């Protein structure tokens, strides 16, 4: 198959103080998800590849059979925290691929654990480009009926013409009522690199549904606090691919007057010494400019033999835009695992 043009994928640069999986977009519950548009003058000089647009959709198995690295995209992203070790086993095989303007976009697998969505995908290009580039999609994934979302994206270059990506995000629904089935859409419209003045426009359009994984919910409702911060761990849910913590925090006005945002990150270990999160976070919503914040974070499945989970919240009080921050450590919450 000769579908080869270069692109890395939608890659979100996370502020240093919020680490690599912090919130990239916390949108209020009633805010409509906005479409990102090019407004950078650099793009006026962008070299647009391709004089015309063609679009071809085909069944994914016929593509995967010719592309060895597509047998298990998630394997490129597994880490020491074992975050995705069961993804391939319990995720849904999406099997969608479309080619437009010489760029093939392929969606491999996806999973919805009841709050968070993880999608593995790949790009294959018509043209070999050896230099490293940061490539972004004009539009990100959308969940029908959600009011917004926060999440992160990763991209790994497999070869000069092949890239694999992993998107993880948390959609937000009114009153935190997460449906049993979600509808996912994605219309990238273009992939671009500002650093290399490269843009590929095309006609890709994907739509698929995901059913919620069954999980075991353990209520916690334990609160830790300092003078200006109150943090409540509400629950923890165990699924075949992930562990999801849900929480709520309340910040006093005095702290918000000094700092523009106060966002939690977590250090999570078990009694055997396994590390599940180390200064990272997830998505959430705030109806009152950060005074109250409801969120969730997910990590991999609990390692066999562990009987306790130690969750240590750390509040990042920040001026944003790299202007400075402080860390506010809270007491750890110890959960006896009933699973």
Annotate the PLM regions.
Residues 33-64:
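Internal signal-anchor transmembrane helix that establishes type II topology
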Residues 4-6, 10, 19-22, 54-339:
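Alpha-helical, hydrophobic structural elements that either
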Residues 1-38:
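Disordered, charged N-terminal biogenesis/targeting segments of membrane/secreted proteins
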